[in-house]
Amino acid sequence: HTMHTMARVKNLNLAEGESPEPMIRVQGETQVVAAAHALIANTDAEAASLVSLYEACPDIVHVVTPGVDLYTFTPGAGRTAAREFVGINHDALVVTFVGRIQPHKGPEVLIRASAELVKHSPQLRPKLVINIIGGASGANTEEVERLKELTSWLGIDDVVSFMPPVPRADLPQWYRAADLVCV
C-alpha cells in the first residue's frame, strides 16, 4: 500500500484555523498499516512517519521515490515558445509554484520571499512574474483567499498571479516558461 498523504502527519502540521483530519481517517489508515504485508513510502521521512506515527514494522516499509513522465516533461521547444504559449513576456523573471494550495507546501513562503525581493531589489519588480498554479485542497478553500489577501497586503498583487489548476497537457509549458520552479 502507498499513502498519498497521512492524516497524522497532516494533523501535526496544521496551520492556524485548519481543522484536523477526521478520526475515522486516522483509524482507517492505522488498520491499513496493521494489515499490510508491504508499505511503500516516497521518502525516508515518510517511511519514518509510518513507523513512528502508525507503528508500522520497519521491515515491511520500502522507499520507492516517485518518477517523472519523461515523455511529457521534456525541454520541448524551449523557454521562448513556452512563454508565448502561456502568455508571459520573453524577458520576464518567472518563478512558478504548481500544486494544491496547502500551508505545508509553502506558497506563503514564496509570496513573502517575493515581497522581500521586490523590497530589496525594486528594479526587478517590472520583470518579476510569480505564478501560483493550483486550487484549494479539500474543504480548505479559505487558504487561497488568505494568500490573495496576504499578496495584496504586501503590495505585490502586480507581481503574483493565482491561477486555477491547468490541464496536465499544459503543465510542461508552464514549467518550461519558468526560470525557477518552487516545490
Q: Where on the chain are the PLM-derived regions?
A:
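Active-site proximal beta-strand in glycosyltransferases
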Residues: H1-N11, L39-I40, H62
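Short alpha-helical donor nucleotide-sugar binding micro-motif in glycosyltransferases
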Residues: P165-V166, Q173-A178
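A short helix/loop element that forms part of the nucleotide-sugar donor recognition site in Leloir-type
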Residues: P20-E21, T74-I88, L147
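Nucleotide-activated donor-binding/catalytic signature segment of Leloir-type glycosyltransferases, i.e.
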Residues: K127, G134, E142-A169
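Acidic donor-binding loop of glycosyltransferase active sites
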Residues: H37, R176-V183
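Conserved donor-binding/catalytic core segment of Leloir-type glycosyltransferases
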Residues: N89-K105, I111-S114, N131
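Carbohydrate-associated surface elements
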Residues: A45, G67
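Membrane-proximal helix-turn-helix segments that form the acceptor-binding/catalytic region
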Residues: A7, P20-L39
